[in-house]
A protein has these predicted regions:
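Conserved ATP-binding N-box helix of the HATPase_c
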Residues: 1-32, 111-121
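An acidic- and aromatic-residue-enriched active-site/binding cleft used to recognize and process polar
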Residues: 3, 25, 44, 138-140
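Residue-level signal for functionally critical sites in structured catalytic/ligand-binding pockets
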Residues: 7, 43, 96-98
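Short, solvent-exposed loop/turn segments that connect beta-strands within catalytic domains
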Residues: 28-35, 125-129
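Short beta-strand element(s) in the Bergerat
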Residues: 34-39, 190
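Glycine-rich acidic phosphate-binding loop
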Residues: 42-48
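Flexible, glycine-/charge-rich segments associated with ATP-binding catalytic modules
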Residues: 50-207
Length: 207
């Protein structure tokens, strides 16, 4: 899954470059043998929102769905200037399975699968309240700590994964502002930063 994210970071960068860094910190305390894996992946260029809103090559069907979603939020007065703006909504929508800004690309699931893998390693908050992941793009910040997870939705004969950060599991409902928010800081591109606690049962030695 990390490989998929690296590919995505390079493909979706308007400068066609991505950068990554990681390190592992082994910990032996209180009779417990654990480790902390730190990972940062980033690219520079257009933000996720800009890749959809200011990109003539972006699939029209996807952009139309995003605009329709914005209209629903506007009609219900769910946007708040400086707190939760259209940019943040579109960035969250872009994480959903099947959504991509690249024409004729069928994947559109690398990010959501990476998020699911993160949660699979992390486990519940009761077991691991250390692991965290953060995505920042443009003026949007999204925090993953396990409070909200990936959900499976069914439409007709199709199944797909969604991450809505609310109790309803509906992207049309405003996400929890503690985890999805508009910030004062602008990052020209996208950063994914993760801190993952690894226990001995998370890693199997191959002899």
């Amino acid at each position: 899954m990390i490989g998929e994210i690296l590919i995505n970071a390079e493909e979706h960068s308007t400068l066609h470059h991505r950068f990554s860094m990681g390190y592992f910190h082994e910990v032996n305390e209180g009779g417990k043998h654990t480790g902390l894996f730190h990972l940062v992946i980033l690219n520079f260029g257009a933000s996720i929102y800009e890749k959809f809103s200011a990109n003539a090559e972006c699939p029209e069907e996807t952009v139309n769905k995003m605009r329709a979603l914005s209209e629903k939020y506007t009609s219900r007065s769910l946007f708040r200037s400086g707190e939760f703006e259209e940019e943040t909504l579109w960035t969250l929508y872009a994480l959903q399975q099947g959504v991509t800004s690249v024409p004729d690309m069928q994947r559109g699931s690398g990010t959501i699968q990476f998020i699911r893998s993160f949660f699979n390693i992390k486990g519940s908050l009761d077991v691991d309240n250390v692991s965290r992941m953060m995505l920042m793009s443009g003026k949007t910040e999204i925090l993953f700590d396990g409070t909200y997870g990936v959900q499976e939705k069914i439409e007709g004969n199709n199944k797909f994964n969604v991450m809505t950060f609310n109790e309803s599991g509906n992207i049309e409902d405003r996400p929890d502002q503690r985890f999805v928010k508009t910030t004062d800081t602008y990052f020209p591109g996208t950063i994914i930063a993760a801190k993952i606690l690894l226990n001995e049962d998370d890693v199997k030695e191959i002899n």
